[in-house]
Amino acid sequence: MHLDQLLQNIPAKIYGKVESIPVRNLTRDSRCVGVGDIFIARQGQFCNGNDYSSQAVANGAIAVLSSLYNPFLSVVQIIAEDPIALEASLAARFYNNPSRHLDVIGITGTNGKTTVSCLVRELMERSGRRTGLIGTIEHILGENRIIDSFTTPDAILLQKYFAEMVKQNLSAAVMEVSSIGMALGRVRETEFLAGVLTNITSDHLDFHGSLEEYIAAKKQFFASLPEKGIAVVNLDCEYAPSFLNGSQARAVSYAIHQEADYRADRLKLYSSGSSYDIWYQGQVFPCETSLIGEHNVYNVLASLAVVHQFLGRDFADLVRDVRFLSAPKGRLDPILLGPFPVYIDYAHTPDALDNVCRILLQLLPKDGRLIIVFGCGGDRDRVKRPLMAKVSEHYGFSFVTSDNPRTEDPDQIIADICKGFSTDHYVVESDRKLAIEKAISMASDKDIVLVAGKGHEGYQIFKHQTIVFDDREVVCEALAALC
């Protein structure tokens, strides 16, 4: 695409001569700018892109998008009152509005986004629809798989990923929609046909400031759904009705404890999975799955509801496919290589940790203990740190350690966590590898060890470096050392 085409009729003031020259790329990183690129100079959380505009021009940028005019730049300047919205608009135009050529399903909520996204994709694929995935664990763009540190990629990358899906002849996409991604405009210009709300509990208050603002960010997503779209909500979540009030999409509900379009009852939860009945339009459909725990009953209900409404496939056939679904990596991931089971889970909020611990408590042999290794991420919601301790203390013995400290002092994060303990049933070990090893050394054959917080992640982030670190590998090595 050429610069004059890209900038045609955009809501911005243009300074400089706009020529018909090829645009190679859009980028927000001045270090990645090459000849023919447009540099997006945005105010970020930790730095201001305007400080790097000159470097971007020196590297070959042919235009700069900003909210501030810089008289010292020699290239075209695109000055917008809302550069976040314009960035998304330019990205969509540059990649030929790829989401219009895909049936896009968005999944939002505090917990369960990753599992529901993966289950929806599996059900879509089993129904004959080639479906991409944008999510926490990975992005699946057809034959290409990409690991990214963001649940919801920035607007430019997102449109690029959608374009790759279209290029590879995919017809649908499922993506996790985070509250931060909504607030930062990452999904603007993405045309969704369906949305799912999993649940709402307190999270990301460091970014949003309050629970009300956090909920408001997620409501934006449902408000953006078209009239022909589908809004699927969990009626056991007290905030669900307010999400429907602001949406013009067709409402669809699921629940366990409330009357809903799709409702599960007669739950039987086992160490190897679960079975239950699903009620839909007065009929009962028996469901069996290898997914463990009540929270996964919700995840299956959400996935079935949106895929059934989306595709109109026979519901009995769809329910039968559930038996073939598997949990994503790092979600109640069992390691059964020693005298006791060890579970890896991504739980990093009080609610998620409570759900996982409650499930594992049901699997404990008589006189067994639940031993929990956990920490909290740095530069993230500090309010939840002592709450995590309260949850862990309620269910078992705790090893408090580092998660991803990022720019914070790991010992200070641990001190914040420990304020939530009311007993001395915990040990502090800031080295995560040592904490896991000590927990496994402490366990007996009647115990269960839970390593929580990082799940699928293969790294650990510190202030000055990111190291290779995989909870599963550490657990396997520690169990092997017992033999």
UniProtKB/Swiss-Prot annotation:
One Gene Ontology CC term in the entry: cytoplasm
Keywords, sorted A to Z: ATP-binding, Cell cycle, Cell division, Cell shape, Cell wall biogenesis/degradation, Cytoplasm, Ligase, Magnesium, Nucleotide-binding, Peptidoglycan synthesis
Entry's EC annotation: 6.3.2.13
InterPro entries: Mur-like_cat_sf (IPR036565), Mur_ligase_C (IPR004101), Mur_ligase_C_dom_sf (IPR036615), Mur_ligase_cen (IPR013221), MurE/MurF_N (IPR035911), UDP-N-AcMur-Glu-dNH2Pim_ligase (IPR005761)
Compartment list: Cytoplasm
This protein's record includes keyword Cell cycle: yes
Top-tier EC class: ligase
Pathways involved: Cell wall biogenesis; peptidoglycan biosynthesis
Keyword Cell wall biogenesis/degradation: yes
Binding site for UDP-N-acetyl-alpha-D-muramoyl-L-alanyl-D-glutamate: 30, 151-152, 178, 186
Similarity-based family: Belongs to the MurCDEF family. MurE subfamily.
Protein name as it appears in the record: UDP-N-acetylmuramoyl-L-alanyl-D-glutamate--2,6-diaminopimelate ligase
Organism, as annotated: Chlamydia trachomatis serovar D (strain ATCC VR-885 / DSM 19411 / UW-3/Cx)
Lineage: Bacteria, Pseudomonadati, Chlamydiota, Chlamydiia, Chlamydiales
